[in-house]
Amino acid sequence: MVTAPYFTLCTTEQMFLDEIAELKWHKTTWAPANGARTHYGTSEDGELTCVVCIKDASEHAPIPVAGLLVHEAVHIFQRWCDDRGEHTPSHEFQAYSIQRISQELMEEFVRQTGGAK
């Protein structure tokens, strides 16, 4: 069975600060430079942990938000592959993995914000 890394979405700086406190990470900068950013760390049991931040989400239309979240999902997948030493994942594995991560990020975005305006 293949397992994905732990990942979560933060749509506000306070959510980010709460999440990194819970993860026991050293303080890091919240502000996504280009609308979104993924922070990486390691859990207490040594597993990859990813915190995706999206800034000013209420100002984005739904399509650009989806694009940003897919972009960050690709980075999560790439980092997870690197972490596992998987340098040649099959195209189908890549597609399904990125789809799953993207969909979960989008569902969480809608849950937190009620959807983009």
Describe these PLM feature segments.
Residues 1-35:
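Non-catalytic terminal regions of proteins
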Residues 88-117:
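Post-HExxH zinc-binding segment in Zn-dependent metallohydrolases
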Residues 59-60, 85, 95:
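Acidic-and-aromatic substrate-binding clefts and catalytic sites of carbohydrate-active enzymes
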Residues 23-63, 76:
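Active-site scaffold of zinc-dependent metalloenzymes
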Residues 10, 50-53, 81:
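Generic recognition of cysteine residues
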Residues 63-64, 68, 89-93:
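Short, conserved micro-motifs enriched in small and acidic residues
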Residues 80-88:
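Short helix/strand-bridging catalytic loops that position acidic/His residues to coordinate divalent metals
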Residues 67-79:
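Active-site recognition of the HExxH zinc-binding catalytic motif
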